[in-house]
């Protein structure tokens, strides 16, 4: 719903994101679509393999959000994007990142259920810090969802 509200706000106010921002948003949207699919598959099929792919992608989405916020500030400083569009941009990034957080929680619960464990935060911490597969998947997702290089200034 919040994403729809952001789109409506852009339309109603006649705002638009720059081409660079649109390209970045497409990358983030692709990552969020993938994490939604993984979380849905893990939940419906109780598929731990899919669930284990969610957390590294969620961490990449967190990093993307921060990088995209920084890049938007640079675009505003260069006059490529407006402050008003920046408010919508910030809301949109937060909403998409929050969606990935929910997916992480769903996948974590699937893993917990399979292990007969009831401590989601402990499970997610263990996945992030002690699993070599996590690091491999994380690097793979970083590569798959990398943002284009900024032009030199």
Predicted regions and their residues:
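Cytosolic, long alpha-helical scaffolding segments
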Residues: 1-153
